[in-house]
UniProtKB/Swiss-Prot annotation:
GO molecular function annotations of the record: NADH dehydrogenase (ubiquinone) activity; quinone binding
Organism name: Lotus japonicus (Lotus corniculatus var. japonicus)
Covalent S-S links between cysteines: none
Protein name per UniProt: NAD(P)H-quinone oxidoreductase subunit 5, chloroplastic
Principal place of residence: plastid
Enzyme class: translocase
Signal peptide: none
Amino acid sequence: MEYTHQSSWIIPFTPLPVPILIGVGLLLFPTATKNLRRMWAFPSIFLLIIVMIFSVDLSIHQIKNSSIYQYVWSWTINTDLSLEFGYLIDSLTSIMSILITTVGILVLIYSDNYMSHDQGYLRFFAYLSFFNTSMLGLVTSSNLIQVYIFWELVGMCSYLLIGFWFTRPIAANACQKAFVTNRVGDFGLLLGILGLYWITGSLEFRDLFQIINNLIDQNEVNIFFITLCALLLFCGSVAKSAQFPLHVWLPDAMEGPTPISALIHAATMVAAGIFLVARLLPFFIAIPSIMNGIAFIGIITVVLGATLAIAQKDIKKNLAYSTMSQLGYMMLALGMGSYRIALFHLITHAYSKALLFLGSGSIIHSMEAIVGYSPNKSQNMLLMGGLTKHVPITKTAFLIGTLSLCGIPPFACFWSKDEILNDSWLYSPIFAIIACSTAGLTAFYMFRIYLLVFEGYFNVHFQNFNGKKNSSFYSISLWGKEGKKKLKNKIHLLSLLTMNNNERTSLFRKRAYLSKINRNVKSITRLFIHSTYFGTKKFPCFYPHESDNTMLFSMLVLVLFTFFVGAIGISFNQEGIDLDILSKLLSPSIDLLHQNSNKSVDWYEFFTNATFSVSIAFFGIFIASFFYKPVYSTLQNLNLLNLFEKNLTKNILADTIINGIYDWSYNRGYIDGFYEISLIASVRKLAKLNSFFDRQVIDGIPNAVGITSFLIGEAFKYVGSGRISSYILFFVFFVLLFLIIFYSFFI
């Protein structure tokens, strides 16, 4: 066991050979490396599997022994300065290592097929492997200096992957936006680290917390300064985990390839901010005002992320705002001091959201064959719909991830979110009401995504691309709700909708696809791969198709995680049955924070609390089903809903409220616009003023001196040309000047 911990230093360096070898291969043997590019997926996956096995072994030792291991090497520069590097192995390290490696392996397998036709395949795997190295180095760091180094490397990999398709201006701008926004938080983190070193003289986690607690207990430190240092450290987590007000970079980060959204922007990198707060929680917990601030930022982010997600049309940006909201729940739990619950939700959310992102990638992958490689179309949920029959496996996986995020038992996020809601009532009833309301809102926007994508009809074939109002059978509002259009008796597109029944693929069902749209076209629409155009020419009529097996494999494994990973944190005990493996793993850290690791509830209390949270989730699902139901839904036959819908359409106040909510959500809460006006525009004006001052004043003075010298030189050059007339003129001029001065002063 001791040897296992001593060998843990290899964890962050195991995936490193892949990007090095890819770089050397492209430099020395570019043709051979590119021809064998698919080969590089195997070592990337294999090396990460080794790290995963090592991490699981460490976790088993942690559960059995409940101890913390730290190994440090000191590099003495002189008698007054020495640098210490090492690694820290505790429960938090084990959890994060398993999370990074498991999700990373599945994303690498998924990416091998998803990125197979991309010219940047090798570059993608090099970036991804280097990101895994950086993230593993971050979670195993034993001091704040190492944390900051790997923190910046993680950010660099994120920027490279966000701007992976750098030839697209939108992706390049998103990369710059992520960089600038995170610079704010990272600068605060650096200042906080320097401030702590100035106070304590140490940056090692094993010494830092004890020194700070002693200084605070003995009143030997300025409480305002130590609070400022804590706030600056927290700024780094706010930016990295996309918390308000530094959240604006995360939705734009979806411009990168979808697999990296599953790994970086759902499971690992954005969780780095949560990890840092969890690592420094013994320090934060000594300053109650900082804990309250963490909880306050968390609850604001919870609400903001949920409200901004309810009207987005881009499926990935919808999931990005969902990630932002769920990270807010984790930050809220840490602010309340619920260390175990925050990490529990970090685990359950990582697998559920990775499943949703990979599912969205499968959907986008199938849509690209129809609408082209344009994110505005392939990721637009308004052009989807009716995908259940075309991508049934993806649909099932996406539904499971959706139910998990909504908090429906027995899926993973139900167990963790339910505990956060319960603890919020003990912390603050106001925060609890907001958190519970947002849980219902989460169910609403997640089922909105599901209904728009998988239910109804395939809207690409009915969407109006030409701007003509009468060219579609169905109109789709900005909210994504379908509404029937009245068809004229004479329809000139019937021949385009007539399908050939000879060449039908096995993926498609035999029943009519768009039956009963209208009596005039009731029997003419069926789903086939080819159609006859005016009876003479065949042209392909594409429909979405299921993804390849390698992509589906990763999704199915994540489905299993979403089903069963919640069992590790079940905290209720009955008749000696203890299922809370997570508390056993976290027992060293929980003892450090003076929390009771034996906290549990009985079955009755559990079912009482769960019934309330599940009822909220089902209410949100019901509202989403009402507003985004397909046009053929049997809910339309209910007199109560018809009556409500009729009254709602006549209510001007309700329309005003709904439109206001939509404008708020679709325009990102006007926060980006506010930053554009108050910060970006101001910086640009200042830059223009600085440019004017630099060119006209700083450069103007030496330029003026140079021009003046040039003119004087030219004048003397003309006078000294050798002409007698020039000399006489010059002599007369100075004689007259002398006489004028003489008579002015002396006479």
